[in-house]
Amino acid sequence: MAAALLDPGELAGLAWCLDAANLPSADLADPGRLFFRFEADSLVGYGGLEGEGADRLLRSIVILADRRGHGLGRTLVTTLEQQARNRGVERLHLLTTTAASFFRALGYTDADRGAAPQAVAASREFTALCPASAAYLVKA
């Protein structure tokens, strides 16, 4: 699967897909975010990283509706994790209300939100966009 960094002008397509999947899209243009387009013959979906340093948020993972159910989500996340490692990321953090079991199967473990690094805990994902009931998972 190929990953390409999105240009700011391409964020509208990502926002549309996130909105269609009932996922947060309000902060896509804020600083400190990298979003990628993933393709395997054609567009599969999107995903992103937020923050700087060794701890970052894995976020905005969305697979196009007509590409779901073919194992592409697993490949997309693995490819995004490699993009993170290439940027010096040691630990990925995420919040989810619907896909905790999917991420657990990929090696993410449940964690206490209160133990999140300050930079992660201060993100809009943590403070405003995701509900307190969202599962918090981490992968080192």
Q: Residue locations for each model-derived region?
A:
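Conserved active-site alpha-helix within GNAT-family acetyltransferase domains
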Residues: T97-E125
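Short amphipathic alpha-helix that is part of the acyltransferase structural core
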Residues: M1-D27, S42, A134-Y136, A140
